Amino acid sequence: MPDYRSKTSTHGRNMAGARALWRATGMKDEDFKKPIIAIANSFTQFVPGHVHLKDMGQLVAREIEKHGGVAKEFNTIAVDDGIAMGHDGMLYSLPSREIIADSVEYMVNAHCADAIVCISNCDKITPGMLMAALRLNIPVVFVSGGPMEAGKTKLANHGLDLVDAMVVAADDSCSDEKVAEYERSACPTCGSCSGMFTANSMNCLTEALGLSLPGNGTTLATHADREQLFLRAGRIAVELCKRYYQDGDESVLPRNVASRKAFENAMTLDIAMGGSTNTILHLLAAAQEAEVDFDLRDIDALSRKVPQLCKVAPNIQKYHMEDVHRAGGIFSILGELARGGLLHTDASTVHSPSMADAIAEWDITQTQDEAVHTFFKAGPAGIPTQVAFSQATRWPSLDLDRAEGCIRSVEHAYSQEGGLAVLYGNIALDGCVVKTAGVDESIHVFEGTAKIFESQDSAVKGILNDEVKAGDIVIIRYEGPKGGPGMQEMLYPTSYLKSKGLGKECALLTDGRFSGGTSGLSIGHASPEAAAGGAIGLVQDGDKVLIDIPNRSIQLQVSDEELAHRRIEQDKKGWKPAQPRARKVSTALKAYALLATSADKGAVRDKAMLDG
């Protein structure tokens, strides 16, 4: 049987000094025989998705101790992408994922912890912790802070979110009073933003990977039911420790749970629910940490056969995460996929022997368990608050309509091809990504004229100054992992195109990425990026570009000979923006850029450079 890792610092005469320090943290003689379970919390007062997590670590800790473990909590950083959006703060968002992954590794390995409970929530925190968990490969359970309630206002007949506030603010026809009303109403409670944005997408995907509990991605942050997820996570962490260290059961290790089958399940779910394109970036990065052979070609293959079963804001205004929960949450989507023969039901989870067992227990259309039905009736209270577990409102009924409800069956899918697609062509030889769930069908094939911007800042200025016209394809380049550096999100350009009435009249292509709040014909992750010699750096103003989503292609309408000539000229100039940018790049960001790969590799560090 494997020894507890913690014995390295808790056993033997030569560890007297280490034990003295452990005792100073509160440990007693009997504790040195127990597993030490790290709690990686991400509480911060900067981020609404994390502002309520201050006491969650100790809630989990008490449960761990009650069931025979020793709990030790530490914190990671957490960047709010919405607050960092639209200025140089966004340069730090994606790099923070690597910092979070490294910090979890540092803390867990430095102190020889035996297992981890990861308390995450927002955009880069869940991916960073996921990368660390798969890198460390010791027992782990994920539990997130949960989504916020959708906003409400008398000025709109649908739920509101952050993107609504941004769009009205950029719309010159909207009064200051309307903008203020949306601003005050869009984000009413603690929790991750209420739509199927990156944070909620990733928290849902941890359910499909088998590393978190049913309801993790959809139970509201404010609802009393969420407390049970934290408590159960603590109990399961102790159980997993016992199964691995006492029974030698390696099946509980994260690399065995998050197998290739699990990654295919997660991506299948992502496509079916129209998740954020950022999830592709993060799943590719996580797969590399798990040493799973899973790449953009695999995602492309899945995108061609998986239907879209769920549409949530920003892809449709009618539904938010609270509505997904009412319809049965993630295990109801997984159940529909399983019945369509699109899921590996033999994949394991940290809470059930197999995905099939979990679906049988948690899919509301399959189980008659009243407790499960009651759980998924948890709904919003409509009371602004930053307090977790502060309300216990329940819907009077579940959404069981699989023909026209929030979650559809395969037979009644929103579309027979899913909500994400990978495009290839001479402008993106290694691929680029589009969230088709947010693209109007009328522009699935679009030919337009390139309008070049060498930064997000110049693109925003150009859009607001009416330099972009109907029929243009906005090209924003040198915003990739190396070129930015940091691969900024382009939520402001896409939101401003919508506010200018160009949401269905223009496209946008970038080697940067998009917020989960983005909709429209917005194509990101162009690989290789411009700074790495990608063809997006060769496009000129006035070039024609043909986008063909059904055929998964994106083509610059320029001859191979002309592209070769342009490449020779660009090599002479160097792969950098044509116009200087007023952008200060810190030493920390330069260090990130030095090792960063393009988006098709997950924007992870280039290990070949480290190994070489």
Curated annotation (Swiss-Prot):
Q: Does the keyword Metal-binding apply?
A: yes
Q: Which positions does UniProt annotate for [2Fe-2S] cluster binding? A: 122, 193
Which terms does the record give in the GO molecular function aspect? Answer: 2 iron, 2 sulfur cluster binding; dihydroxy-acid dehydratase activity; magnesium ion binding
Per the entry, which co-factors are needed? [2Fe-2S] cluster; Mg(2+)
Binding locations of Mg(2+): 81, 123-124, 489
Its EC number(s): 4.2.1.9
Instruction: Quote the record's cofactor note.
Output: Binds 1 [2Fe-2S] cluster per subunit. This cluster acts as a Lewis acid cofactor.
Q: What is this protein called?
A: Dihydroxy-acid dehydratase
What organism is this sequence from?
A: Stutzerimonas stutzeri (strain A1501)
Lineage of source species: Bacteria, Pseudomonadati, Pseudomonadota, Gammaproteobacteria, Pseudomonadales
Q: Write the gene name.
A: ilvD
